[in-house]
């Protein structure tokens, strides 16, 4: 049984399915609170020809609002 399970699912896929199922089962009040836990914010800098260019920030919550 374990061999068949490993053949079809990686642990990452299994964890993704479990977390998605739990999120779908939550009450609406809690769902809104949980959605914000997945947001990511970070800074990144592009490099070109060995020189640093402008540093930019990224916020997944703001980019999701634009869509």
UniProtKB/Swiss-Prot annotation:
Localization per record: Mitochondrion; Mitochondrion inner membrane
GO CC annotation: matrix side of mitochondrial inner membrane; mitochondrial inner membrane; mitochondrion; proton-transporting ATP synthase complex
GO molecular function: proton-transporting ATP synthase activity, rotational mechanism
Pfam families in alphabetical order: ATP-synt_Eps
Keyword Ion transport attributed: yes
Keyword Transport: yes
Family: Belongs to the eukaryotic ATPase epsilon family.
Protein role: Mitochondrial membrane ATP synthase (F(1)F(0) ATP synthase or Complex V) produces ATP from ADP in the presence of a proton gradient across the membrane which is generated by electron transport complexes of the respiratory chain. F-type ATPases consist of two structural domains, F(1) - containing the extramembraneous catalytic core, and F(0) - containing the membrane proton channel, linked together by a central stalk and a peripheral stalk. During catalysis, ATP synthesis in the catalytic domain of F(1) is coupled via a rotary mechanism of the central stalk subunits to proton translocation.
Subunit-structure text: F-type ATPases have 2 components, CF(1) - the catalytic core - and CF(0) - the membrane proton channel. CF(1) has five subunits: alpha(3), beta(3), gamma(1), delta(1), epsilon(1). CF(0) seems to have nine subunits: a, b, c, d, e, f, g, F6 and 8 (or A6L).
Protein's UniProt name: Putative ATP synthase subunit epsilon, mitochondrial
Lineage: Eukaryota, Fungi, Dikarya, Ascomycota, Taphrinomycotina
């Amino acid at each position: 049984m374990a061999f068949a399970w490993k053949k079809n699912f990686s642990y990452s896929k299994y964890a993704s399915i479990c977390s998605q199922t739990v999120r779908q089962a939550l009450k609406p009040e809690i769902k809104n609170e949980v959605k914000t836990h997945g947001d990511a914010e970070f800074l990144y800098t592009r490099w070109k020809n060995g020189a640093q260019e402008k540093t930019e920030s990224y916020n997944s919550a703001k980019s999701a609002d634009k869509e």
